[in-house]
């Protein structure tokens, strides 16, 4: 008699409307229960029985109920699943396939089957890309996935690379090339500079050589520098299939052990690469640097032919300048080039120290592998004088390009850095005041004031203060119109010196050429391409970090590291512990609260100040040097747990 009763239907509707509901993100725990995070301040408890219907990271709506005198969230509706397309490891049981998602907070296998178009035969230990097609909160009795493609077979030493690239949907092979891409298409006049003593300085094993340099002393102690850059845009037509592919990739993806090129290797490592004794087309820039270090305003961009006279390595050049080895340049003319470039480098470092912002030297770490791709060691690489020679030359070239584009077009792809936003600027001023460093918001939000602040901090040389100030700084970005680069201390900056490796530099090449050729219909780059380049840069950076984390866990699980003591620097303070970097090899480790002090209530982690207090006393802070011992290597989550060695 109650069937289709409108009064009953209305009553149900009213009850549903009155039942409190919330939306949020599911957060799981090690102990089976979870929480629904509504915002940074508010979360609701999800009992273990209800957690069985959701996954960590799911966005859901839930009904709020009182159960055993506690307010709980009962998942009701799936808004957006955490898993859609995902990567995981295959397990085969009783001829049935399961996939274990490769995400730290997901602990359960998901039943799966290959998609009809997927021809791979999967075995235990293989890795695959999958798509979640059934979710319990949608009324399905189990979670279920479809295998889209195989990533890599079990026990392949390249698992860390292929799985990570697949996770981030990044390419793992070089682009395909067509015959037309090998033909030089630009018939514009080129100056013949093949008689000049151009040299390249790079790593021993570098094959994609972008830049060559020639320098000479002219009147009054001034220096004339010609920067010659490889010219791939004379081979790759704008809008061609390869150009579209390069735009999509954005960058050559440099990963531990190898790279995935933006352009086909036949272009990037052969036809366009400025290999020694090979005649190559280039886009060149002639710049005069005055004896006080200033760049002369008269800048000339032009097309040319060059022939590099020697491929030099950073280590050999640095050793020779520092008189540390028996190596010496092949000829007096090459020797003279190195000496003049060294002089220019010191001149510009002095100028930038007083007028801009100088980079602080930092350690870089490089993995070493066996012939079969097994990680064997990590070596420290320091930035030496030859690195600085190239760096200063490229900075000169990029300042010149930005100036040239601004004067002639008013647009391009500019590298920018905004310094501090207004809110963070207030935090910086307040923080510095605690150390009797007096600055104003108005002052440090100008380029001049920001540079002055950085110079003061460089002189102060306090790692803790520097780390806190860096935390407040904006991230680097790209802009279509001229804009300052606060982190470099420059009014404008536009890179064009790596067109083999960066699509933004290819865009700037085409714009510079259009000015040289006096084209009238020059198209301004779109905001869309700028955003895509930024996003691709972010994804590449995350992939490189993820692979490194994986390799560190593989390396440090070896027996010889079990009880070894490591010097480390604290780099972050979180709610549950501290993160530190091992100085010997660059690995990041986590030290949980329990390993710092047995009574949790007596521990205070202040994330804002980056300090850890025990019973109200400051014990640790970011930048502190500590000694740690590895406690646990978690290969599944690629995390390294350590404890402080007291």
Curated annotation (Swiss-Prot):
Q: What is this protein called?
A: Exoribonuclease 2
Listed A to Z, the keywords are: Cytoplasm, Exonuclease, Hydrolase, Nuclease, RNA-binding
The chain positions of domain RNB read: 190-517
> Gene encoding this polypeptide?
rnb
Q: What reaction is this protein's catalytic activity? A: Exonucleolytic cleavage in the 3'- to 5'-direction to yield nucleoside 5'-phosphates
Q: Cellular component GO terms, alphabetically?
A: cytosol
- UniProt xrefs under NCBIfam families: 3_prime_RNase (TIGR00358), PRK05054.1 (NF003455), RNase_B (TIGR02062)
* Taxonomic classification: Bacteria, Pseudomonadati, Pseudomonadota, Gammaproteobacteria, Enterobacterales
| Domain S1 motif as annotated: residue spans | 563-645
């Amino acid at each position: 008699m109650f069937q289709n009763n409108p009064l009953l239907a209305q009553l149900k509707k009213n009850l549903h409307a009155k039942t409190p509901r919330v939306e949020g993100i599911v957060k799981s725990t090690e102990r089976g229960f979870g929480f629904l995070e509504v915002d940074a301040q508010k979360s609701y408890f999800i009992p273990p029985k209800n957690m069985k219907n959701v996954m960590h990271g799911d966005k859901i709506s839930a009904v709020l109920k009182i159960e055993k005198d506690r307010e709980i969230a009962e998942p009701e509706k799936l808004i957006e699943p955490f898993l859609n397309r995902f990567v995981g490891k295959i397990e085969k049981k009783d001829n049935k396939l399961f996939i274990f998602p490769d995400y730290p907070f997901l602990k359960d296998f998901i039943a799966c089957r290959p998609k009809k178009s997927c021809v791979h035969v999967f075995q235990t230990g293989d890795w695959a890309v999958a798509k979640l097609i059934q979710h319990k909160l949608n009324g399905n009795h189990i979670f279920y996935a479809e295998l889209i493609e195989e990533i890599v077979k079990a026990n392949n030493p390249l698992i860390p690379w292929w799985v990570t690239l697949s996770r981030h949907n990044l390419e793992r092979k070089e682009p395909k090339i067509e015959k037309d891409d090998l033909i030089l298409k630009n018939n514009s006049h080129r100056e013949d500079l093949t008689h000049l003593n151009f040299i390249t300085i790079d790593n021993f094993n570098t094959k994609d050589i972008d830049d060559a340099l020639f320098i000479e002393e002219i009147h009054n102690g001034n220096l004339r520098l010609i920067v010659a850059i490889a010219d791939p845009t004379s081979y790759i037509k704008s809008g061609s299939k390869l150009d579209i592919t390069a735009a999509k990739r954005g960058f050559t993806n440099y990963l531990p052990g190898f790279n995935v090129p933006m352009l086909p290797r036949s272009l990037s490592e052969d036809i366009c690469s400025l290999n020694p004794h090979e005649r190559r087309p280039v886009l060149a820039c002639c710049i005069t640097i005055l004896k006080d270090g200033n760049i002369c305003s008269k800048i000339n961009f032009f097309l040319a032919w060059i022939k590099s006279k020697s491929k030099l390595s950073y280590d050999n050049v640095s050793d020779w300048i520092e008189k540390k080895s028996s190596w010496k340049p092949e000829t007096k003319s090459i020797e003279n080039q190195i000496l003049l470039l060294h002089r220019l480098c010191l001149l510009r470092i002095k100028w930038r120290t007083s007028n801009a912002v100088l980079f602080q030297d930092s350690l870089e770490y490089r993995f070493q592998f066996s012939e079969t791709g097994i990680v064997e060691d990590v070596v420290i690489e320091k930035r030496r004088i030859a690195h600085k020679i190239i760096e200063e030359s490229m900075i000169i070239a990029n300042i010149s390009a930005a100036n040239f584009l601004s004067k002639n077009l008013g647009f391009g792809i500019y590298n920018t850095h905004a310094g501090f936003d207004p809110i963070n600027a207030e935090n910086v001023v307040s923080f510095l005041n605690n150390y009797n460093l007096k600055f104003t918001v108005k002052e440090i939000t100008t380029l001049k004031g920001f540079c002055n602040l950085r110079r003061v901090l460089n002189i102060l040389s306090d790692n803790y203060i520097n780390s806190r100030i860096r935390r407040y700084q904006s991230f680097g970005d790209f802009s279509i119109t001229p804009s300052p680069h606060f982190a470099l201390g420059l009014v404008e900056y536009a890179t064009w010196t790596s067109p083999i490796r960066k699509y933004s530099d290819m865009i700037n090449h085409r714009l510079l050429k259009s000015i040289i050729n006096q084209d009238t219909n020059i198209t301004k780059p779109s905001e869309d391409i700028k955003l895509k380049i930024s996003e691709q840069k972010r994804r590449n950076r995350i992939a490189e970090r993820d692979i490194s984390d994986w390799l560190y866990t593989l390396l440090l699980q070896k027996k010889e590291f079990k009880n070894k003591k490591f010097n480390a620097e604290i780099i972050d303070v979180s709610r549950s512990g501290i993160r530190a970097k091992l100085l010997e090899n660059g690995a990041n480790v986590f030290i949980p609260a329990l390993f710092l002090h047995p009574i949790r209530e007596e521990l205070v982690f202040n994330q804002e100040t980056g300090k850890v207090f025990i019973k109200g006393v400051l014990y640790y802070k970011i930048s502190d040097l500590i000694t740690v011992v590895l406690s646990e290597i978690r290969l599944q989550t690629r995390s390294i747990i350590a404890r402080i060695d007291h």
